C-alpha cells in the first residue's frame, strides 16, 4: 500500500468501517497466521492468537493511533502475543513439573518402605 493510501485505510479502521476490517483480514490473516505458526509451533494456537488480534482491533481501534506501517505493526503485535503465549505456557509447564515433583516426593517414603521389604 502507498503511504497515503495506508493512512486512509488506518483511518477507516479507527472509524470501524466494516469493509476496511474485511479487507484487513483478507490482506493480512494468512501472513500473520504463518508467522504465528512459526513462533508457537501450533496451528490452533496460532489461529487463536491471530484471530484474537483482529477481535481486539475491532473492539479497540484506538490501538492504531500513531501506526504508520500497518503490516509491520501487525507483525509486531502477533510476535508479541506469541511471545506472551510462550511465556505463559512456560510458567504453566513449570507449575505442572513442581506439582508432579511434590506428588513424587510425598509418595517417596512409601516407595522406600516397599523396596525395603
Across the structure, where does each feature detected by a protein language model lie?
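A short, glycine- and basic residue-enriched loop/turn
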Residues: 29, 43, 61-67, 71
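Structural recognition of an alpha-helix C-terminal capping motif at a helix-to-coil junction
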Residues: 34, 48-55, 59, 68-80
Amino acid at each position: 500500500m502507498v503511504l497515503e493510501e495506508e493512512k486512509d485505510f488506518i483511518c477507516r479502521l479507527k472509524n470501524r468501517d466494516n469493509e476496511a476490517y474485511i479487507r484487513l483480514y483478507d490482506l493480512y490473516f494468512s501472513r500473520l497466521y504463518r508467522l504465528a505458526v512459526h513462533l508457537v509451533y501450533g496451528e490452533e494456537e496460532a489461529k487463536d492468537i491471530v484471530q484474537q488480534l483482529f477481535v481486539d482491533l475491532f473492539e479497540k481501534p484506538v490501538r492504531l493511533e500513531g501506526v504508520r506501517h500497518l503490516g509491520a505493526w501487525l507483525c509486531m503485535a502477533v510476535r508479541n502475543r506469541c511471545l506472551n503465549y510462550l511465556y505463559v505456557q512456560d510458567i504453566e509447564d513449570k507449575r505442572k513439573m513442581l506439582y508432579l515433583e511434590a506428588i513424587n516426593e510425598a509418595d517417596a517414603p512409601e516407595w522406600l518402605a516397599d523396596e525395603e521389604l
